[in-house]
Regions:
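Short, Lys/Arg-rich, polar N-terminal cytosolic tail immediately upstream
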Residues: 1-23
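A structural signal for multi-pass alpha-helical bundles of membrane permease subunits
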Residues: 24-309
Length: 309
């Protein structure tokens, strides 16, 4: 015996369903409202204030200011200190990026093949990531001391002479880059280990049957192509982290000697909190953010075309 639908029951169900969906939508928006307000207050509003301030002549402590258009940006383009800090930053990134990515991949491959000692090596290589860089910078200052540091002592023992790593303009940025790589290798290793774990072992067995017996052949034909997405992520995160160098410069060199280690973030810090040129520091910050954005988008576009999923 078939059930008979009551007249108007379908319309009532549609109205009830629409009312229920509306209530759920309002409830969801209400639950998301506190997080949205927090995001606006902590992220978007400071960025808006920063953009507005970059078009003024405001200095820290001043009671009034005037809008001066693009004067701060034109000043930055002609500022030799800004150009020098930009070059030092690019040099630092140019050393850290390939070094941290390649060494992180190498360490991940070596650790991945371990059985009993894998956890031990993972902890050892990841320790620099968990350490406070400001505290470790003090340790590095001692290690690199021209007379008391063990590194120079070892170099003197093997006849390589003593080197003023932090006071030689030609060595200071590469030295800071080595410290940056030391901190990033462990983090990149963990990411590459995750990528290696996702590669099916059947592919290696099939490649071995097809005559790809050597480790280098397996790496070039299977491991490296399938690590494409992981490598793209590692390159982008490493480059952004490298561009944000500040702690080691502030603690170890303060931009010296003679500005040879002054990087973008440290220049922004000096302009804003030492010279109180707040508006000019805001303009430099905008340039810095735009530069990182363009660099990251360009990296993503180039790497995306070469990644094999």
């Amino acid at each position: 015996m078939s059930a008979l639908a009551l007249p108007g029951s379908g319309a009532r169900q549609r109205r009830f369903g629409g009312r229920q969906a509306f209530i759920e939508k309002i409830t969801g928006m209400g639950l998301a409202l506190p997080a949205t307000i927090l995001l606006l207050l902590t992220s978007l509003m400071p960025l808006v204030v920063l953009c507005v301030m970059s078009f003024t002549d405001y200095e820290l402590g001043a009671v009034d200011f005037e809008f001066i258009g693009l004067a701060n940006f034109s000043k930055a383009m002609g500022d030799p200190v800004f150009r020098r800090s930009l070059w030092n930053t690019l040099l630092y990134v140019g050393i850290v990026l390939p070094g941290a990515v390649c060494l992180g991949l190498l360490v991940a491959i070596l650790v991945y093949g371990r059985k009993r000692t894998r956890s031990f090596y993972e902890i050892v290589y990841f320790l620099p990531v968990t350490s406070t860089l400001i505290a470790m910078a003090t340790v590095w200052q001692f290690l690199l001391h021209p007379r008391l540091g063990p590194i120079n002592t070892f170099l003197h023992m093997i006849g390589a002479g003593e080197h003023a790593f932090l006071s030689d303009p030609a060595l200071v940025v590469p030295t800071l880059a080595v410290i940056g790589m030391w901190q990033l290798i462990g983090f990149n290793m963990v990411l590459f280990l995750a990528g290696l774990s996702a590669i099916p072992k059947d592919l290696y067995e099939a490649a071995e049957i097809d005559g790809c017996a050597g480790g280098i052949d397996r790496f070039l034909t299977i491991t490296w192509p399938l690590l494409g997405p992981t490598t793209m992520f590692v390159i982008i995160t490493t480059s952004i982290t490298a561009f944000k160098i500040f702690d080691t410069v502030a603690v170890m060199t303060q931009g010296g000697p003679m500005g040879s280690s002054e990087v973008l973030l440290y220049s922004i810090y000096l302009e804003g909190f030492q010279y109180f040129h707040t508006a000019y520091a805001a303009a430099l910050t905008i340039v810095f953010l735009v530069f990182i954005l363009v660099f990251s988008v360009a990296q993503s576009f180039i790497l995306e075309r070469r990644v094999h999923y």
